């Protein structure tokens, strides 16, 4: 597992400390794995591993844009698998994407099949730093938690993050949540989910705090089943409340959307 990096604890010793790995200003291209994690595989049987994938202020190549592409994993099958995590598979691990202001990390290419450069697993992903993270692969087999605490995350491929939060929701249906934009603790930051002219459905709760923004470009659509938004929803795209769904728009700017709001 792990075509480029394997951060794994196969030790059953419960006293084994959690690991911490920093991956800074590093591009991953053309990596393959017969198992899981085409570029990166991380899992632990004890405490979660902590992985920091960062682009700092010093990165100047390609105008400050770092691109990870053409990574794939087969999951011990006959061909590439989204469930295996073409770019990364994270089990009991917490991964932070820390992108500096004015820098961009692009994972995947929309011209490739979505299985290439996919992210899968049940861990936790946190976006920090005021820079941009662009996800262009099919990440529907990522069922862990995702939090955008600072900066922008752009979804470049339709229906590519549908099942975020599913693992937690299966374990605790009474406390079910999916993707979170903004936070109470990091209220001084500005966090944004940017949906270009693509179509996205979130099965579990999409939650926005006061410092969170959901931008939906013209031609784009976001379908929500549950959750609430206390921040800003903007853009010329469409927000759809799914049939039998329930969504609370609580922010003063939550109706800044110039496109349609549709209730199925």
What are these regions (language model features)?
Residues 3, 20-21:
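Extracellular beta-propeller repeat domains
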Residues 104-108:
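Bilayer-penetrating membrane-interaction modules that drive fusion, pore formation, and translocation
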């Amino acid at each position: 597992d792990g075509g480029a990096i394997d951060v794994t604890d196969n030790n059953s010793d419960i006293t084994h400390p959690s690991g911490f790995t920093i991956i800074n200003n590093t591009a991953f291209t053309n990596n393959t794995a017969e198992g899981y994690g085409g570029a990166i595989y991380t899992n632990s049987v004890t405490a979660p591993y902590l992985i920091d994938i960062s682009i700092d202020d010093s990165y100047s190549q390609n105008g400050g844009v770092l691109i990870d592409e053409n990574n794939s994993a087969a999951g011990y099958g006959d061909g590439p698998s989204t469930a295996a995590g073409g770019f990364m598979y994270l089990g009991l691990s917490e991964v932070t994407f820390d992108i500096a202001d004015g820098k961009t990390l692009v994972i995947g290419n929309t011209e490739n099949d979505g299985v290439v450069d996919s992210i899968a697993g049940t861990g936790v992903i946190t976006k920090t730093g005021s820079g941009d993270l662009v996800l262009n692969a099919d990440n529907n087999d990522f069922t862990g938690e995702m939090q955008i605490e600072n900066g922008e995350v752009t979804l470049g491929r339709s229906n590519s993050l549908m099942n975020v939060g599913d693992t937690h929701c299966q374990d605790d249906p009474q406390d079910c949540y999916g993707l979170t934009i903004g936070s109470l603790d990091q209220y001084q930051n500005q966090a944004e989910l940017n949906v270009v002219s693509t179509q996205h459905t979130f099965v579990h709760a999409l939650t926005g705090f006061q410092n969170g923004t959901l931008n939906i470009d013209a031609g784009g659509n976001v379908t929500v089943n549950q959750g609430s938004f206390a921040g800003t929803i903007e853009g010329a795209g469409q927000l759809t409340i799914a049939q039998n769904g329930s969504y609370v728009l609580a922010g003063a700017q939550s109706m800044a959307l110039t496109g349609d709001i549709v209730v199925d």
